[in-house]
Regions:
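Residue-level hotspots at or immediately adjacent to binding/recognition sites across diverse folds
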Residues: 2-359
């Protein structure tokens, strides 16, 4: 369910129903690890377990990415609270990016003696034990972004040539999934329980950077293309039915990204923006095709969004209690119960949140 880190790793339709009929949410502050003041929620499983990043470096005002020394991956449950997942032995930074329903978490960590730009894909067991998933042969760095129910993992790895290719890991082996033609950076950002993988291939060193979203179906990589007239797209998440979400530019997007959805036949749909906004991005989708992400308002402020086929694109801030004290900035993932995680500001700091639908 995630591409939200890929941008950092590599360098949201008018509401159709009345507000009375719109889905509303309760909100929980997931908090931070002891001594921290910033956190982000990156993924959520169907049991409501959230994983993400907490900032032990106190780089206040910036969303935690798990790419800065002192930042640590975490897992959180409502009953157990937040747990520091730590790093590989002697390392200084980690990010927890994906989690399956068994509580197995994937992400990345640097290694002892490595600079904080060299990472290895890692996996944490449900008990917190960390495993280095390694890199493709000759590669210096790798990252894991999602794990499915079978324990299949997707992400990326450097090759000895310096090119980055989409990668998968199973209990038996690491596999090079390749790249779209002429790409220099390719990452697998999400995987469903059928083993379908989506992500992006980036072409050239830019600027401008151009990329295309892709779908890997087990043997071949398909270019998902862009909105009409576009040059750039990213596929960030895929659900059980093969519905894919991400972002694309196009001739009608005024030079900005719009959140998009590819249906199970890979036909692309522009999901639009918050009314008055100019851009949007979709980061997560559940099996009911509820889509979450973020977009801008007319004043260019970034707000977390939710999109449904009946309600269109909505600002999540309009769907939580008005006296909550929160400004929700980004929604990264949504589970099949409709619970959403991401990050927002409360009391001047970025904190991870959990939204739960009010039935």
């Amino acid at each position: 369910m995630t591409g939200r880190i890929a941008g950092a790793w590599a360098a949201f339709v008018l509401a159709a129903g009345s507000m009375a009929a719109a889905q509303t949410y309760t909100i929980i502050d997931i908090g931070v690890l002891k001594g921290d003041n910033e956190s982000s929620g990156f993924a959520i499983n169907n049991l409501g377990e959230v994983v993400g990043c907490s900032d032990t470096k106190n780089v206040q005002g910036y969303p935690c990415t798990g790419l800065v020394p002192g930042q640590h991956g975490f897992s959180w449950t409502q009953s157990g609270g937040m747990k520091d997942l730590g790093t590989l032995s002697g390392a200084t930074v980690s990010g927890a990016i994906g989690v399956n329903d068994s509580g197995t978490v994937v992400g990345y960590s640097n290694m002892k003696g490595q600079i904080a730009t060299n990472f290895n894909a890692v996996q944490w067991s449900s008990t917190g034990a960390i495993t280095n998933l390694g890199t493709l042969s000759g590669g210096s760095s790798s990252a894991a972004f999602e794990i499915n129910s079978a324990g299949e993992v997707t992400g990326d790895s450097f090759l000895s040539s310096g090119i980055v290719n989409a990668t998968s890991w199973t209990s038996k082996k690491i596999k090079n999934l390749g790249a779209l033609s002429k790409a220099i950076f390719t990452a697998g950002l999400a995987i469903n329980d059928s083993g379908q993988i989506v992500g992006e291939s980036v072409f050239g060193y830019g600027p401008p950077f151009t990329s295309h979203g892709f779908l890997w179906n087990g043997s071949t990589m398909k270019d998902l293309g862009t909105l009409t007239g576009g040059i750039t797209s990213v596929a960030n998440a895929i659900n059980t039915s093969g519905v894919i979400v991400g972002q694309s530019d196009g001739s009608n997007t005024r030079g900005s990204w719009h959140a998009v959805l590819w249906n199970s036949s890979d036909k692309i749909q522009d999901l639009g923006t918050i009314p008055g906004g100019t851009y949007s991005i979709a980061f997560g989708v559940n099996d009911s095709s509820v889509v979450v992400g973020y977009g801008n308002l007319s004043n260019n402020a970034a707000h977390a969004t939710v999109w449904t086929s009946t309600g269109g694109m909505q600002d999540l801030n309009s769907l939580i209690p008005s006296n909550s004290g929160w400004v929700l900035i980004n929604a990264n993932a949504v589970n099949n119960a409709g619970q959403i995680t991401g990050y927002g500001t409360k009391g001047g700091s970025n904190h991870a949140f959990l939204l739960t639908p009010v039935n």
